[in-house]
């Protein structure tokens, strides 16, 4: 078997090859008329891939399924148990074939946040050290709102002819999660996002989109650097 040159290329620390970065988004959910149904997946994959390029960590691709609360019916999702099982299987496969020991999961879909409660068990069943990065979720704002629109502009996946229709909330109830009354009652953050979209509308700002991406990418790179320290 050939001896691998772990120091080859633009690599600051050869131990980074033991670290993987994987996106966790959602491929099948509505985001209003201006955004594709796999917006979350593409945003998460971009962040994970760019962080991989900058740090040298292994890019592991993206998890296929996603979870969502029952009271938010805006796409096709799986149960939390099924998502957990898929993540375990995916990470075990990466560990087997790529010899990784640590992973940063880049979450770009708010519905996946409950998976954080299962991280201890996922680590136990994969024997991996895992960091769950939620930076983009905490900064992008409402579902289908200005943050996602602006990042979509950066990626070139926005339908600009439909931006004016993005806030037709009677037709596109998923924008800001406006039409999901039970979810709004249960979560003050969802209620705040829905009101923001209703009262202030949405806008597209490519500079803002780049700033959001930079914040998220830098956060993931920082997590990778933390994993290098132990």
UniProtKB/Swiss-Prot annotation:
Question: What processes in GO biological process is this protein linked to?
Answer: F420-0 metabolic process; riboflavin biosynthetic process
Any single Pfam family the record assigns to this protein: Creatininase
Q: Which domain of life is it from?
A: Archaea
Q: Which pathway, per its entry?
A: Cofactor biosynthesis; coenzyme F420 biosynthesis; Cofactor biosynthesis; riboflavin biosynthesis
| Binding-site residues for Fe cation 1, renumbered to this chain | 29, 40, 109
On cofactor binding, the record's note says: Requires one Fe(2+) ion for activity.
The cofactor(s) it depends on are: Fe(2+); Zn(2+)
Positions contributing to Fe cation 2 binding:
31, 40
Q: Which InterPro entries match?
A: Creatininase-like_sf, Creatininase/forma_Hydrolase, FAPy_deformylase
What reactions does this protein catalyze? 2-amino-5-formylamino-6-(5-phospho-D-ribosylamino)pyrimidin-4(3H)-one + H2O = 2,5-diamino-6-(1-D-ribosylamino)pyrimidin-4(3H)-one 5'-phosphate + formate + H(+)
- Describe its partners and assembly state: Homodimer.
Give the UniProt family note. Belongs to the creatininase superfamily. FAPy deformylase family.
According to UniProt, the name of this protein is 2-amino-5-formylamino-6-ribosylaminopyrimidin-4(3H)-one 5'-monophosphate deformylase
Q: Which organism is it from?
A: Methanobrevibacter smithii (strain ATCC 35061 / DSM 861 / OCM 144 / PS)
Its lineage reads: Archaea, Methanobacteriati, Methanobacteriota, Methanomada group, Methanobacteria
Please name the gene that encodes this protein.
arfB
């Amino acid at each position: 078997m050939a001896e691998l040159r772990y120091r080859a290329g633009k690599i600051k620390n050869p131990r980074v090859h033991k670290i993987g970065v994987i996106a966790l988004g959602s491929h099948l959910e509505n985001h209003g008329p201006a955004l594709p149904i796999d917006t979350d997946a593409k945003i998460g994959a971009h962040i994970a891939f760019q962080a991989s390029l900058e740090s040298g960590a292994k890019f592991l691709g993206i998890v296929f399924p996603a979870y969502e609360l029952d009271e938010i019916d805006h796409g096709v999702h799986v149960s939390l148990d099924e998502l957990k099982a898929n993540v375990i299987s995916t990470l075990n496969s990466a560990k087997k074939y790529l010899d990784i020991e640590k992973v940063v999961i880049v979450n770009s879909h708010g519905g996946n946040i409950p998976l954080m409660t299962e991280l201890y068990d996922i680590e136990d069943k994969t024997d991996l050290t895992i960091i769950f990065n939620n930076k983009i979720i905490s900064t992008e704002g409402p579902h289908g709102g200005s943050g996602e629109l602006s990042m979509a502009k950066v990626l070139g996946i926005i339908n600009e002819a439909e931006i004016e229709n993005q806030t037709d909330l009677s037709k596109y109830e998923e924008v800001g999660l406006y039409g999901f009354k039970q979810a709004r009652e249960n979560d003050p953050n969802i209620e705040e996002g829905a009101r923001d979209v209703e009262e202030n509308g949405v806008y597209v700002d490519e500079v803002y989109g780049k700033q959001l991406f930079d914040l998220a990418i830098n956060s993931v790179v920082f997590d990778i650097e933390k994993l290098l320290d132990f």
